[in-house]
Amino acid sequence: MSGPVPSRARVYTDVNTHRPREYWDYESHVVEWGNQDDYQLVRKLGRGKYSEVFEAINITNNEKVVVKILKPVKKKKIKREIKILENLRGGPNIITLADIVKDPVSRTPALVFEHVNNTDFKQLYQTLTDYDIRFYMYEILKALDYCHSMGIMHRDVKPHNVMIDHEHRKLRLIDWGLAEFYHPGQEYNVRVASRYFKGPELLVDYQMYDYSLDMWSLGCMLASMIFRKEPFFHGHDNYDQLVRIAKVLGTEDLYDYIDKYNIELDPRFNDILGRHSRKRWERFVHSENQHLVSPEALDFLDKLLRYDHQSRLTAREAMEHPYFYPIVKDQARMGSSNMPGGSTPVSSASMMSGISSVPTPSPLGPLAGSPVISATTTLGMPVPAAAGAQQ
């Protein structure tokens, strides 16, 4: 049997081909280290699989920062994260890397970031209005379209990696530790993203995926927000995850996808997939979530949650969907990417008939200051933990 049918991204296919090698060749990247003594840890914010995260103070200017101390992993992976963060610095809604220092105790690298008030999306988004959801989804799309245009897939889009300062309506896409450069025809590791947000391509072991993986993950976030069901696809393991998806999208389209790309399904699926019809999105609407659902929301969701990665909306196409007409209209009127606090109700009657332009947000200002940790006393002291890691 011949192997899987190759696939290439529909957009930004060759951006890395047209850039100098040093842009994407992260293994050759030379890291410029800042001064660890500029930083003093204040409290622990959380821990992840690959890092521990602290709130800290840059003692040269008294500004709050966030310090991500990386756990011992391959130098190659650390260099990849640093190179990607440097390439994306200043992009819309991308967390700003301010400095890189070495933890004086473990000698492992520590990344210093701009501080964002620490409400993670997961805690916040079950309280959001219809307008809020549209607003923040649009802000995430700005970050995704930007990183994709720069030849980079995030590969770990999920609520935990979206930081929102709701008071100032400021959003940042964080944790670029799994992000990777897109090269057409390259086969990638499918062990990326978090289970509930893994695209079908990962679950069926199709390695020639692209930026569209991030759009599936975004669709999972949207579904959980508008239906108030967290997570929306709740698999108990990676095999069950595909079953949960098939119970909503149906098995017929799944097999069409498998056939189109000549994918060989793991035999373990034989006993668990079964046969399922495609469900209408309306069946997930009930009295508790109907205020968040609209025809345009369901149409938008339907265009993201597609088995075939090539059929999903791109980030730029998504920004032009009628679901965002009220946001585009307001941002054009305000001439700004940050709306004032408000939770304007949205009705289909308020939809514009078309979009003339999508405003480009101004880049984030540079962070004053430099690297990561001052530690003779601080690192040795117990640090109180806070809910919700920032990085």
From Swiss-Prot:
ATP binds at residues 45-53, 68. Its main location: nucleus. One of its GO terms (molecular function) is protein serine/threonine kinase activity. InterPro entries: CK2_alpha, Kinase-like_dom_sf, Prot_kinase_dom, Protein_kinase_ATP_BS, Ser/Thr_kinase_AS. Residues 36-41 are annotated as: Interaction with beta subunit. Catalytic subunit of a constitutively active serine/threonine-protein kinase complex that phosphorylates a large number of substrates containing acidic residues C-terminal to the phosphorylated serine or threonine. Regulates numerous cellular processes, such as cell cycle progression, apoptosis and transcription, as well as viral infection. May act as a regulatory node which integrates and coordinates numerous signals leading to an appropriate cellular response. The active site is at residue 156. Residues 335-346 have a biased composition (Polar residues). Its EC number is 2.7.11.1. Residues 39-324 form the Protein kinase domain. PANTHER family: CASEIN KINASE II SUBUNIT ALPHA, CASEIN KINASE II SUBUNIT ALPHA-RELATED. Belongs to the protein kinase superfamily. Ser/Thr protein kinase family. CK2 subfamily. This is Casein kinase II subunit alpha. GO terms for cellular component: cytosol; nucleus; protein kinase CK2 complex. Gene3D superfamilies: Phosphorylase Kinase, domain 1, Transferase(Phosphotransferase) domain 1. It is an enzyme of class 2 (transferase). One of its GO terms (biological process) is Wnt signaling pathway. Residues 335-363 are annotated as: Disordered. Tetramer composed of an alpha chain, an alpha' and two beta chains. Interacts with RNPS1.
